[in-house]
Amino acid sequence: MKTHEILFQTLSQADDYVNGEQLAKELGVSRTSIWKAIQRLEKDGVVIESLKKKGYRLVSGDILLPEVIASNTQLTVTLNEECHSTQLDAKLGMEAHKEGRALYLAKSQSAGKGRFGRDYYSPDQGGIYMSLHLKPQLPPAELPPYTLMVAGAIYKAIKNLTLIDV
């Protein structure tokens, strides 16, 4: 993982401020690298409070960490900074005969597609763009209810993890 990703994990697990010197030592990098990693996180929308003599504290925000998602889900996770469409990424993965159980994520997509190839509005900031490639052992006629079940599960997960009613 990159320095800013490890720093994010460290700050998100801390109960209070973490001293910059302590962070540099834990991560095995310079204080300048910590400062640059904080700037990168802030650029990605993460709010970090900084106080002299105390250190840094994560206030709000989140980032996508494919390694963490993969280790908790048993999925192959691919993250693109930007793509045309995560649906297209998943389709290309299927056409390349990649194994199922793959999650395709993007921070932004320029030509998002939804179900049935419909255009999907996807602004650059604030979205979660993903497509899941599975190979269910069901006949196609039994698959439509799964879209609703997945949507409900995603809603519940976001609400429980963020306390935001989406």
Task: Enumerate the language-model features and the residues they cover.
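N-terminal lobe of the biotin/lipoate ligase/transferase fold
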Residues: 2-163
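Active-site phosphate-binding and catalytic loops of NTP-dependent enzymes
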Residues: 166
